[in-house]
Amino acid sequence: MIDTLAVKSEPCGQNRFSIVWSWHKNNTKNPIGGSFYVTVDSSVTEDAGALAEMRAIYYLLEEAHVHGANRLGNGICIEQSFGAIRKSLLKKSLKTSGLGKTQKAQIANAAEFLATKYFGAVVTVNAKPKEMTFKSYVESDIELKQDYPRAELPCTLIGADIAISRHALYRQVARIDQKITHPNLLDDLSDVPDARFEAGWVWLRRILASDKLQEMQVRKGSAHKTPQQYASARYLHFADSEVPAVVVIDEDASGWVAKTVLRADQAQFLDWPAYVVGQRLVPARIFERHRQNKDRS
């Protein structure tokens, strides 16, 4: 059986909305539900209602946990009022471009947590929700500031939470889960089952909490120039994986963000420990280059 989270907004002032919500466990006819007010930042001049519903969905899933602790999107239907939200989360488009179909950037940004942690959820438009009797009813009051809330995972190594970008999750699916190595094939994940994206989230949750995660430094004098967007990044290496990986994190105004996930063999610009060969130490980059050449011969 599928569970349904439904939200409906009504304007009740300048960038202020009344939200009525319900949670139907196994599509019960007597759901739990409630209402609250969402105040959207005054800088928002368009799509305030859609952003208010996104903030409401985030609150219900990430703060109130109406669906249960540690649950992802599989088996959940999210009913809301705006076509732009649904378009921003179309699975086929997400799997081929990393973006949905919507042209509204702020809605796509606000939907980041649904495109990552809750990838498996089904998002629909329900402009005319049914009248219902609630099993229980809760009221509260929240606000949406300029920074959209993000789904985060705790990282033991750095002692902070890390937001997971959709690019990082999708690169984990492509490079680590699906073992895709050809650059031209990384962006087309249309044949990958939805479940693998949620498995990617679980993988990130596991390795970021692992005591086997190690931070690596960029090798001094490295000829490899890291991409500009990762110039101030930190590199977290996890070797205990079928495909050893490096999670690239950076800090923005809201905190730490996982920007991408690399295979360890892509990160030769890092200062890897030397290998012992016979009676001498061989720099890791030279050892790996020799091994790759030997494999090709």
Describe each PLM feature range.
Residues 152-228, 294-297:
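Compact soluble domain cores
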Residues 57, 64-136, 141:
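RNase H catalytic domain
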Residues 38-70:
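Acidic helix/loop or adjacent segment enriched in Glu/Asp that either coordinates divalent metal
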Residues 240-297:
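A short, surface-exposed interaction/processing loop segment used at functional sites
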Residues 1-47:
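RNase H-like nuclease fold core
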Residues 129-167:
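Surface-exposed beta-loop interaction hotspot
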Residues 219-251:
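Exposed beta-strand-loop-beta-strand "reactive/processing" segments of non-cytosolic proteins
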